[in-house]
Regions:
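Gram-negative outer-membrane beta-barrel transporters
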Residues: 11-19, 27-30, 35-126, 213
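Residues on the lipid-exposed face of transmembrane beta-strands in outer-membrane beta-barrel proteins
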Residues: 1-3, 58-62, 99-103, 113, ...
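Residues that define the transmembrane beta-barrel architecture of outer-membrane proteins
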Residues: 4-6, 52-54, 91-97, 143-147, ...
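Extracellular loop and loop/strand-boundary signature of outer-membrane beta-barrel proteins
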Residues: 41-46, 82-88, 133-138, 148, ...
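Short coil turns and loop connectors of transmembrane beta-barrels in diderm outer membranes
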Residues: 6-7, 20, 66, 107, ...
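C-terminal beta-signal and adjacent terminal beta-strands/loops
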Residues: 117-129, 152-214
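Surface-exposed loop/turn segments flanking beta-strands in extracellular/periplasmic regions
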Residues: 24-44, 133, 181-193
Length: 214
């Protein structure tokens, strides 16, 4: 669905993808490899008989004035799962909102602010052995947001300079390890699972670029 009028735009889209034989890490070991002290199970990628990814996408563009424009889009996940086990297919935000405010200050100067808001992120329900996750393997990433600012100057009709800062408030997200616990029961050496904390969110970053057009 979409509506347009006098520079305004609003829309919403429903999407659904039903999969057969989607590739996913298998749960059943197909063999083992051993050293003098360690025995490790071997797993392989397998086909998921049925899986589904479903959600909503929305957009809203607002012409605040002749020189200011506000654009927004959001994705909300309704489901993303293995239909055989009910487990999540991957670690993705419940929703992602992107908002951009652009101001054409002068014919050759523009300013822009960007805002991204990520929803809750949940890990898989089952580990690589097909058992329910426990302890730190169940850790979720809480919602958080990132703000960016930039300015562009058109030096000539062919050359422009852009400078700005990403992650203005220096929001940090640290990777704590692999999603699930691995280790050896005989030696007691374990690397405990990190749940959804499997990626880094870089801190504040300053940048500058030169762009050319022909």
């Amino acid at each position: 669905l979409e509506w347009k009028r006098d520079g305004w735009l609003a829309g919403v889209t429903w999407f659904r993808n039903d999969y057969r034989n989607k590739i996913e890490a298998g749960y059943a070991p197909i063999g083992q490899t051993s050293t003098s002290k360690v025995t490790t199970d071997i797993y392989q990628w397998e086909n998921v008989p049925k899986a589904v990814v479903e959600g909503l996408e929305g957009s809203l563009n607002v012409p605040v004035s002749d020189t200011i424009n506000w654009t927004n889009n959001i994705t909300y996940m309704l489901q993303s799962k293995n239909k055989e086990t009910g487990d999540r297919l991957s670690i993705i935000p419940e929703y992602t909102l992107n908002s951009t405010l652009s101001w054409q200050v002068h014919q050759d100067v523009s300013l822009q602010s960007t805002f991204t808001w990520y929803g809750k992120q949940q890990p898989k329900k089952y580990n690589y052995k097909g058992q329910p996750v426990t302890g730190s393997e169940k850790d979720e990433v809480s919602p958080y947001s990132i703000l960016g600012l930039s300015a562009t100057w058109d030096v000539t009709k062919n050359v422009s300079l852009t400078g700005g800062v990403d992650n203005v408030f220096d929001k940090r997200q640290w990777r704590a390890g692999n999603a699930q616990t691995t280790g050896n029961t005989s030696t007691g050496a374990y690397m405990y699972g990190a749940g959804a904390y499997t990626y880094n969110e870089p801190g504040r970053t300053w940048y500058m670029s030169v762009n050319t057009r022909f």
